[in-house]
Amino acid sequence: MSIEKVSILGKESIHVGYGIQSHIVEETIKCLASSTYVIISDTNMSKTPTYEKLQDSFQKELAKQRPQSRLLTYLIPPGENHKNRETKAEVEDFLLQQGCTRDTVILAVGGGVIGDMIGFVAATFMRGVRVVQVPTTLLSMVDSSVGGKTAIDTELGKNFIGAFHQPEFVFCDVSFLQTLPKRQLINGMAEVVKTAAIWDETEFTRLESFAKRFLAEISAPTPNLESIKDELIKTVLGSVRVKAFVVSADEKEGGLRNLLNFGHTIGHAIEAILTPEALHGECVSIGMIKEAELSRYLGILPPSAVARLSKCLAAYGLPISVDEKIFSKIIGAKKNNLKIDSLIKKMLIDKKNDGSKIRCVLLESIGKCYESKAHQIFKEDIQVVMTDEVFVHPFANRHPESVSITPPGSKSISNRALILAALGEGTTRIKNLLHSDDTKHMLDAVVLMKGATVSFEDSGDTVVVQGHGGKLFACKEEIYLGNAGTASRFLTAVAALVNSTQDEKSVTLTGNARMQERPIAALVDALTTNGSKVDYLNKQGSLPLKIEAGNGFKGGRIELAATTSSQYVSAILMCAPYAEKEVTLSLVGGKPISQLYIDMTIAMMKDFGVDVTKSETEEYTYHIPKSVYQNPQEYVVESDASSATYPLAFAALTNSSCTIPNIGSSSLQGDARFAVDVLKPMGCTVEQTSKSTTVTGPPIGTLKALPEIDMEPMTDAFLTASVVAAVSQGTTTISGIANQRVKECNRIKAMVDELAKFGVSADETEDGIRIHGVQLRDLKTPGGRGVKTYDDHRVAMSFSLLAGLCKDPVLIQERSTTGKTWPGWWDVLHSKFNAKLEGHEYIRQRSGSLRNGDRSIVIIGMRAAGKTTLSRWLAEHLNFKLLDLDQYLEKKLAVDIKLLVKEKGWDYFREKETEVLNECLEKFGKGHILATGGGIVEGEKPREALKNYTKSGGIVLHLHRDLKETVNFLSKDPTRPAYSDDIEEVWKRREKWYHECSNYHFYSTHCTSEAEFANLKLVFAKFVSKITGDDTFVLPATRSTFVTLTYPDLRKVPSLIKDVSETSNAVELRVDLLANQETAYIAEQIGLLRSVATDLPILYTVRTKSQCGQYPDEDEEGMRKLLMFGLKMGVDIIDLQLISSPSTIAEVISKRGHTKIIASHHDFTGDLKWDNVEWKNKYAQGVSIDADFVKLVGMAKTFDDNLLLENFRRQNTEKPLIGINMGPQGKLSRVLNKVLTPVTHELITDKPIGVGQLSLKEINQALFQIGGLLEKEFWVVGSPVSHSRSPALHNAAYAALGLPYKFDIFETDDAEKVYSQLMQKPTFGGLAVTIPLKLDIKKYCTELSESAKLIGAVNTVTPIADGRKGFLGDNTDWIGIANSFKKADFALASGVSNGLVVGGGGTSRAAIFALHSLGCQKIYLLNRTESKLQDLVDSFPDYDLEILLEKNASSVSIGLVVSCVPGDKPLDETLMKKLDGVLSNNKGDKQTRPLLLEAAYKPRVTPIMELAKEKYDWTVIPGVEMLVNQGEAQFKLHTGYTAPYKVIHSAVLNE
């Protein structure tokens, strides 16, 4: 057994080895005599063989050596969330109960949580007992166990309460690591890399070379760490020795020890927010990169060191950005909580700070810290580094008069050098290589294909490439290239040379979203013509590509169009020496684009030993011999001439001087001519030697425009030229840059659009741009979101120059995009040009939370799914135009579709259909409903267009109905072209396409009557309002409830649903309890539920078995699909279980749209008491994922469990909490819960036993009995009121809901009496006001609702804050009118766009308001006294009101009439004559449904009702309906509850 010992604080107390459990036991018992030894670990560790062996050995050895001593063990739950005061106290209580004294020796066996917390226990128990650290994770071995720092966490931060307490021994047994999962091993490597980065470059270099072997071993199906134990021991020792040395020099962290906190200032802040999902090492890894970038920003650390650190961490599988795909998946929705203010707040309470000053360790180079101490850093600098947007402040006169800038290596040369070196034989040292995203992707790809071995020297400045002579092999991993266009083109050609392996037969190249739009077809065509087999995996002509290995490169003559990108030409040139036959490459069709880049490639091939000869007989034709590149010993990459244009342009714009010391006239790069060909004619002084270039700008405001400049030799530099031209005198026209339209973005359009924000006019030409310069004083500061960079590095850098010339700071989005070619550009701007930068955090709105506004909506679905009808309704509802794409196609082609299909076939029709879809999405992107044909999803291209539309935030709505009904309908419809397949087969084929192309789904219930159609129209309108964001669920200010439906098939209980749900605020659909969980069945159930409970929000729940439901826990993918389908159905609320995988949680949260989220957790065992930290963690998790509500359900075993819950509720208020206990003893919790309490109903007979469910009535009765509800009194006031039905209505509802309220009459015509005798009573609950007090009562109201103000009358009074803040006057008469029409299916009424009000009194005003709310465009007025009507017209100036004259009465179109004249008095003959004309002209028939509402409820049938119904067949609504509907609205205002409609209706009618 080999054991390495490390001295710390003068004592060799750190022992490192492999399989040293026996040594741990012997040393502890021999050296640390004690009556009691206590092994403390966690419940996970205790199950491992290594722990069991240690405990058994200790027991046996103790019996031999110290038989009088005893061994105790104590286990705590695992995880950082248990490293707290409570757990520490539990451990201490255990020690006290066991009679432990000051001679006790504690062994802390576990990871950092155990080491930290048990070390702190040892430090404080009996004022300090001895402790032995036995770290079992890599992280704890190299970090927390060494140095005596012990602590626990609090809610305010990590490790804030603790002590320095040195362990007697630290035993690092590397064999313990065998028990760790892969992620935990990787996690530990962060601290290892950190230690080497701050202290020992030699060790850092060793770690770089060890990464591949380490990752391969721990990733094996059955890892065997013994095979790498020597390297692992070296790894642990390397870190431990550094930490021991530092601790020995600075035990209490006074100075030097602070260096160990590199990466922790930012890393700890990130960890505090992302724990427990993100691990310590992962956060420190990201923190190291951010702090290294901070050092670079401050001009201390070279960019190459940042790149090297980044590459090393990534090589170990550690995240280097929170945006990394895998890390983002792990942390899920918590990523949204990484707000800069929150992070800085966490940094401000870091232990190593000096007061409120943030201190941070700055790296000077790999292996060395700046000035060997932590430095004060400013929040402003952190903000720049931590955010991806930046404000560029005016340059003013802060910049130096002259400066020398060395840009990073040329991207073009760097990428070519890496390809040539990888294909070559031998080792080459590449200096000044560009360290950027592009070259990182290139390096990673070369290594993945085993084309070369890559290492670093000179602190990362030199890249050592050992080429394998063109021997490349297929790899399993996808090669991800981000948005690296150069890398994608070069590697596509290189991949054609790849050989297959036993397991892998192809190479896949992919990239980000923009890369998957960029063209590569011309290169792929050339390769496939030459024998390669390349498949497009997504969009034709773009990445991702699958390239079959082993086909080789045939060679011979290859022709490419001269207009082809020079990168395609270079790709083939560089691979040509490895073809089977010598290659002749001919560029045909004119002068090649970017000839200089082709010349560059040929010159570099020569440097690597291959001579390309130019044909003497054919223009633009090259002969490439078969050969193998020979790598030169050293290759120096020239600085990037395109990047050099930015500092040179800075000088031009600011009347300063800038020198680029390593780019001159001898450069191979076309952009090296920028200074001479562009800046000099614009008025700059230019001095250029063969190796350097200096530009001095003219006096500010004197730059001259360039009338004509062909920038074809330096196309990338046109953006820089454009921003200089923007402030030059005159118009500049740039040509020869057509290829810039297909770069990272359409750069020409981008320049036109973004220059406009600065007040600079520019327009596109056929192959360039024309810019009309402005005076500096006329340059505008872009408002709003500032400059959009389109994820294009050159757009960002160009506009960072123009931004500094504005009067105010300018926002630049996506600043990190410059990492493509110049990662340190912002650092140069800040530290070299003294520009003031300010980081800005864009707070993104929830995905989908924006209202749809006027954006067009696309409709898809099968034939006969109701697309025509529902599209028409949708257009009406949104006031959009309806465009039927089939009709548009017929009009465009001047042919009937049926005939078109018959003559030219379905394929031709589909092709034309696709063209029309793309055209309409482009032309009619706003204010339209685009209704498509059923087969739009048959083609890949239209499917892609639809999916892209949803990705961009547009709505694609899939309409569907019962398939049998669809079949029945289509079989009877001769007007449509016949399907060639069976309809059901067509549906089966298309179903998955409809789902993947749409982001919303609406199921239409089958309608057989006008009433059902009217209801469907109402349901559909509500659905549309939800998905467009116009009407989303809002939590009531009062107590709220939901009722749960547990039926397997709602079709069997439709009437029951309405009765049991109407008094709740939402209805829960338990999807897991349905008869089956097929999406079609669920859609049907939701459709039915919506049709029955039209006004109620739907809570969509899929509960797993472990959470008291029926859905299988193991079917995570099925759960994800069901939740996503719920979102697609546009449900109001969705229940998201907190035990779901982080990826499921993240997807639901990110795609929630306008659906509210309940984050839920259930414990039906009763083992978790409410003072257990697990509940706190679950609540915090719900908060962290940004759920709208958190629902936590426990099981009450005692009555006191309810009191513990209430204490928990008081302490956790960040998000609304639904907190209840199940079980009979938990009923009190349901009574006390205020937010969305689950309730049952008296009519539900099959209630679950033992759950403790209560009805709303039972809850209210119990709440009254314990003082939670107080008695209240309500009155109807006015005169006469003795026959009012209001008391009957309200008292019936109180009784039904168990409310301790009383409603009575108060007869008076004196408002003052009402105020003094009723409204001042402590039990006052509210008033129903009738004549003659509707106007007089207003003076006693401190507030009036908008409806009361406009109508001018109050019929409802409620106290504000129990009357302490006065009284609210409202009007519910208009709601009574509007809801009476709605309940009578007004949606299908003819001429609904126009209404008529008969009468001129107070109720007429409410009628006008109601008709307007129902969407009547014009409202006619009719009364005996026309002067009264003019007063009404004047009172509603914004409404289209018209007094109905006798001559027009028989000709106007009217669908809704409200009669507001007394029902028990004779009517004026003239008025009746006019009314007769209206009724006659609009009488009902089979197609029309005109409606008349009688406002008077006495007598039951009035003369007007009789005339309308009997003579003209109008549907009449008696006044009693208005009374009930008005009372229902009034009841809700008074109590906050919804009245049971049947109950109040019956109470009013049964006099």
Swiss-Prot record:
Pfam families (alphabetical): DHQ_synthase, DHQS_C, DHquinase_I, EPSP_synthase, SDH_C, Shikimate_dh_N, SKI
UniProt entry tagged with the keyword Protein biosynthesis: no
Annotated NAD(+) binding sites: 42-44, 80-83, 111-113, 116, 136-137, 158, 176-179, 187
Requisite cofactors: Zn(2+)
Stretch list, region 3-dehydroquinate synthase: 1-379
Compartments it resides in: Cytoplasm
Pathway stated in the Swiss-Prot or TrEMBL entry: Metabolic intermediate biosynthesis; chorismate biosynthesis; chorismate from D-erythrose 4-phosphate and phosphoenolpyruvate: step 2/7; Metabolic intermediate biosynthesis; chorismate biosynthesis; chorismate from D-erythrose 4-phosphate and phosphoenolpyruvate: step 3/7; Metabolic intermediate biosynthesis; chorismate biosynthesis; chorismate from D-erythrose 4-phosphate and phosphoenolpyruvate: step 4/7; Metabolic intermediate biosynthesis; chorismate biosynthesis; chorismate from D-erythrose 4-phosphate and phosphoenolpyruvate: step 5/7
UniProt record, GO biological process: amino acid biosynthetic process; aromatic amino acid family biosynthetic process; chorismate biosynthetic process
Catalytic activity: 7-phospho-2-dehydro-3-deoxy-D-arabino-heptonate = 3-dehydroquinate + phosphate; 3-dehydroquinate = 3-dehydroshikimate + H2O; shikimate + NADP(+) = 3-dehydroshikimate + NADPH + H(+); shikimate + ATP = 3-phosphoshikimate + ADP + H(+)
Region (EPSP synthase): 392-835
Note describing how the cofactor binds: Binds 2 Zn(2+) ions per subunit.
Top-level taxon: Eukaryota
Binding residues annotated for ATP, in chain numbering: G861, M862, R863, A864, A865, G866, K867, T868
UniProt GO MF annotations: 3-dehydroquinate dehydratase activity; 3-dehydroquinate synthase activity; 3-phosphoshikimate 1-carboxyvinyltransferase activity; ATP binding; metal ion binding; shikimate 3-dehydrogenase (NADP+) activity; shikimate kinase activity
Chain intervals for the UniProt region annotation (Shikimate kinase): 854-1044
Start and end residues of each stretch annotated as 3-dehydroquinase: 1045-1258
CDD domains (alphabetical): DHQase_I (cd00502), DHQS (cd08195), EPSP_synthase (cd01556), NAD_bind_Shikimate_DH (cd01065), SK (cd00464)
Main location: cytoplasm
EC number: 4.2.3.4, 2.5.1.19, 2.7.1.71, 4.2.1.10
Catalytic residues in the record: E253, H268, H1162, K1191
Segments forming a coiled coil: none
Classification via PANTHER family: AROM/DEHYDROQUINATE SYNTHASE, PENTAFUNCTIONAL AROM POLYPEPTIDE
Name of the protein described by the UniProt record: Pentafunctional AROM polypeptide 1
